[in-house]
Amino acid sequence: MPRSLKKSPFVAYHLLKKINQMNKAGKKDTITTWSRSSTILPSMIGFTIAVYNGKQHVPIFISDQLVGHKLGEFVSTRNFRTHIKADRKTKR
């Protein structure tokens, strides 16, 4: 269910503050964050944001196609490892 149009999109305050400071300074450094629920805004385009997946920070380059999505959509938290196929020699 999408967020109500009466409300503005959710962005963590500390993340928005860092982006605004870096826009004023003209820097494009990597920003680390744990806020997976923050919405990507047009002011974030061109930045690299490292989002925490539970183990490490995964960098995401923000482009215009990602605007409106959440940061957590692009970083997987679960790692599926394929099942080991049974070796025929060990079954004998």
Swiss-Prot record:
This is Small ribosomal subunit protein uS19c. InterPro entries: Ribosomal_uS19, Ribosomal_uS19_bac-type, Ribosomal_uS19_CS, Ribosomal_uS19_SF. Transmembrane segments: none annotated. Keywords: Chloroplast, Plastid, Ribonucleoprotein, Ribosomal protein, RNA-binding, rRNA-binding. Protein S19 forms a complex with S13 that binds strongly to the 16S ribosomal RNA. It holds the Pfam family Ribosomal_S19. One of its GO terms (cellular component) is chloroplast. Gene3D superfamilies: 30s Ribosomal Protein S19, Chain A. GO terms for molecular function: rRNA binding; structural constituent of ribosome. The keyword Ribonucleoprotein applies. HAMAP family: Ribosomal_uS19 (MF_00531).
